[in-house]
């Protein structure tokens, strides 16, 4: 199924900002779903819930959106460059991407919690809400699995759709955590989320590997 979608898409354009008039729907939907899953149970959700106890939810979400957009713009730039530089080795890239998603599955099972320093920083944040939240999330997302997942997706899909989709997916997941925390007064069901997200990562990784090997 994924191979059919890939083969029917138009040739990849070079990475030129503004070159695409509309975000590719496939890349947008795929990236939104994958990053939403990657963010479930992530430390960023805990940070979002903590910040929401100090600042207005609107300001928290604006800060998260700004930070995510910047980090993921860099991520898709890296991923798209890799995909473009190795355009003649797409099968190999698919296999490597598949292995990466299997690693993300293991990472998810291991869990990702706030360190004491990160928790204290979120609780004691002062100053302009949007700036405080934005800086904290920007630093927290550098090297995080959502950033790495975005890079991996961008090696396979259009950069603009991946950028917008990954940003929407992360903000939606963090907004969900804030709402659940505010309405229900508790975290999302950690065990169910952990195993469900890991399973989805593993399935997607295996599909990519199978495509790279030409099995379907």
Where are the predicted features?
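Hydrophobic alpha-helical transmembrane segments in multi-pass integral membrane proteins
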Residues: 137-145, 203-216
């Amino acid at each position: 199924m994924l191979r059919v979608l890939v083969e029917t898409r138009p040739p990849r354009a070079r990475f030129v900002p503004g070159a695409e008039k509309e975000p590719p729907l496939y890349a947008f939907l795929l990236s939104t779903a994958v990053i939403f899953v990657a963010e479930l149970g992530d430390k960023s959700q805990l940070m979002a819930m903590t910040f929401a106890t100090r600042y207005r939810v609107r300001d928290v979400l604006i800060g998260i959106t700004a930070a995510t957009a910047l980090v993921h713009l860099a991520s898709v730039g890296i991923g798209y460059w890799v995909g473009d530089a190795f355009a003649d080795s797409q099968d190999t890239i698919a296999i490597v991407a598949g292995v990466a998603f299997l690693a993300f599955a293991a990472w998810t099972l291991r869990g990702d919690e706030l360190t004491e320093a990160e928790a204290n920083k979120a609780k004691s944040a002062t100053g302009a809400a949007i700036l405080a939240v934005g800086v904290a999330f920007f630093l927290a997302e550098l090297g995080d699995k959502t950033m790495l997942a975005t890079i991996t997706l961008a090696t396979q899909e259009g950069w603009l759709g991946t950028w917008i989709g990954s940003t929407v997916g992360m903000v939606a997941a963090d907004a969900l955590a804030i709402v659940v925390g505010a309405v229900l007064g508790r975290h999302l069901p950690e065990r169910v989320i952990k195993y469900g997200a890991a399973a989805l990562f593993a399935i997607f990784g295996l599909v990519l590997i199978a495509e790279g090997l030409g099995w379907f």
